[in-house]
From Swiss-Prot:
Coiled coil: none annotated. A motif (Nudix box) lies at residues 36-57. It comes from Escherichia coli O1:K1 / APEC. Residues 3-131 form the Nudix hydrolase domain. Gene3D superfamilies: Nucleoside Triphosphate Pyrophosphohydrolase. Keywords: Hydrolase, Magnesium. The gene is nudJ. This is Phosphatase NudJ. CDD domains: NUDIX_Hydrolase (cd03675). Its EC number is 3.6.1.-. It is an enzyme of class 3 (hydrolase). One of its GO terms (molecular function) is thiamine diphosphate phosphatase activity.
Length: 153
């Protein structure tokens, strides 16, 4: 049975810069957007806000849905990655709460698009989607019978 990993990611933008998180994987420092897996007891928007806080210490809510990417990683792991936009008025300090995150950096779009240390090609693709102006209302992602507590009828 096909069971893709459901993940969320945040393109965080302030004052012309984008926020990336840096983590060391197999001895290499890699950049990613604040991102992670959906948990069973949360909506996609809640997951995005949680991952942002865990990985950067920033408490903010996504303002827009950008895109859903269906992707097969090089190790053949399937993903459905839901991408959200978060616009901040100004660059703010970061304090990761997730021990897997080494640091956070505010960088330009060009630095991301030209970087050789991206965790996946989706990091650059997410910036391209953001730059293209793709934005959809959060209501596009509906919660049905949420929270799910009554069982199947």
């Amino acid at each position: 049975m096909f069971k893709p990993h459901v993940t969320v990611a945040c393109v965080v933008h302030a004052e012309g810069k984008f926020l990336v998180v840096e983590e060391t994987i197999n001895g290499k420092a890699l950049w990613n957007q604040p991102a992670g897996h959906l948990e069973a007891d949360e909506t996609l928007v809640e997951a995005a806000a949680r991952e942002l806080w865990e990985e950067t210490g920033i408490s903010a809510q996504p303002q827009h849905f950008i895109r859903m990417h269906q992707w097969i990683a090089p190790d053949k792991t399937p993903f459905l990655r839901f991408l959200f936009a978060i616009e901040l008025e100004q660059i703010c300090p970061t304090q990761p709460h997730d021990s897997d995150i080494d640091c956070c950096r505010w960088v330009s779009a060009e630095e991301i698009l030209q970087a050789s240390n991206l965790r996946s090609p989706l990091v650059a693709e997410s910036i391209r989607c953001y730059q293209s102006g793709q934005r959809y209302p959060l209501e596009m992602i509906g919660d049905f019978n949420w929270p799910f507590t009554k069982g199947v009828i």
